[in-house]
Amino acid sequence: MESLAALYKNHIVTLQERTRDVLARFKLDALLIHSGELFNVFLDDHPYPFKVNPQFKAWVPVTQVPNCWLLVDGVNKPKLWFYLPVDYWHNVEPLPTSFWTEEVEVVALPKADGIGSQLPAARGNIGYIGPVPERALQLDIAASNINPKGVIDYLHYYRAYKTDYELACMREAQKMAVSGHRAAEEAFRSGMSEFDINLAYLTATGHRDTDVPYSNIVALNEHAAVLHYTKLDHQAPSEMRSFLLDAGAEYNGYAADLTRTWSAKSDNDYAHLVKDVNDEQLALIATMKAGVSYVDYHIQFHQRIAKLLRKHQIITDMSEEAMVENDLTGPFMPHGIGHPLGLQVHDVAGFMQDDSGTHLAAPSKYPYLRCTRVLQPRMVLTIEPGIYFIESLLAPWCEGPFSKHFNWQKIEALKPFGGIRIEDNVVIHENGVENMTRDLKLA
């Protein structure tokens, strides 16, 4: 296997090619990419946790340092001004020397406002990409060249196609997340609270709450019916019934995003439903291939949901086809089958059909689907089906002609378990699909 340094070298070659193309298309000389700045809480002197500009960390694995700048023109070696103040109040990261620094010119920037004296005098034809437009104006960058939509659309579109370096980083992120999931399951089995399970997860992955790529969803019992539950109860429930964990990790700026659901007991209706959702998720992944729209896989899983609702007698006296046609599967799986994954958890350009940013919206029947692209090699996506028992979504079905098909007694019995979600991260290849999550033996 090639070293990370060799993979990174080729990664930079790819980014340089994309940069040359986008600069030529939009008649720019270079791109100035800003890592970002710290922003203080309103009426306070404490900053919010720093989150780096994803377009910056696409080039360099510098994720925790604000006030850095990267100048790229697609021809010359990328130049990084690395913020290196004299500061005895805060930790100061040293000038980096790592596997990637041979491919980038690294220069110390001692003052946050010192970049102006470092840049070329003629800046009218430089594009700025970053979160602080007023900083770009202070640097005399033309307003029309600040986060230009066409440039960002182009860069976002090609971010869907991961380089070998990016795939290597994502596989490392998987390893960290899998370790966390194993530790969290053990904590659940030992009767810990959501708060303490989360601590076990963070310890196993080596993350802080501010370092994980998204807020961990640690949901016991009926909390699993809240799709993005992030409360973290300090008190363990008197009865453990179910545990849904949606939690990831980050490596060199690249995310993992995994979900598992466990039943406290191994032989009840809920446990059997968990097993069946898991089996159907794996069966769907086995069918995935390049050249097929992601939307098709979402629709196919609604057909699989219908099969499970019928098998478990949650919906009765109705064909699977009629369930899908009349959207009786909708309240049980109200979200999409997944989303693109990469530098961001919900990675960009899921709706883009070309590098000009042509948008194809999700089908009106499934408005929360986050991707409508045709799958191609090097794309990385999540596959995360679920079945939930959500009061607000089921209540409208209590009346009307379809109510008689719902087994309300069974549904009431399952509500205390909340729901089920199983999520793997997959890579599309020329001749198949790689399941990064299952390759690490996470059941």
Curated annotation (Swiss-Prot):
UniProt keywords, alphabetically: Dipeptidase, Hydrolase, Manganese, Metal-binding, Metalloprotease, Protease
Cofactor(s) the protein needs: Mn(2+)
Enzyme Commission number(s): 3.4.13.9
GO annotation terms (biological process): proteolysis
Cofactor binding, note field: Binds 2 manganese ions per subunit.
Record: residues binding Mn(2+) 2: D246, D257, E423
Transit peptide is among the record's keywords: no
GO molecular function, one term: metalloexopeptidase activity
GO cellular component, one term: cytosol
Catalytic activity line of the entry: Xaa-L-Pro dipeptide + H2O = an L-alpha-amino acid + L-proline
Domain of life: Bacteria
Top-level EC class as recorded in UniProt: hydrolase
Amino acids binding Mn(2+) 1: D257, H339, E384, E423
InterPro entries per UniProt: Creatin/AminoP/Spt16_N (IPR029149), Creatinase/aminopeptidase-like (IPR036005), PepQ_N (IPR048819), Pept_M24 (IPR000994), Peptidase_M24B_aminopep-P_CS (IPR001131), X-Pro_dipept-like (IPR052433), X_Pro_dipept (IPR022846)
Its biological purpose: Splits dipeptides with a prolyl residue in the C-terminal position.
NCBIfam families registered for this protein in UniProt: PRK13607.1
Family affiliation: Belongs to the peptidase M24B family. Bacterial-type prolidase subfamily.
Name this polypeptide is given: Xaa-Pro dipeptidase
Species: Salmonella paratyphi B (strain ATCC BAA-1250 / SPB7)
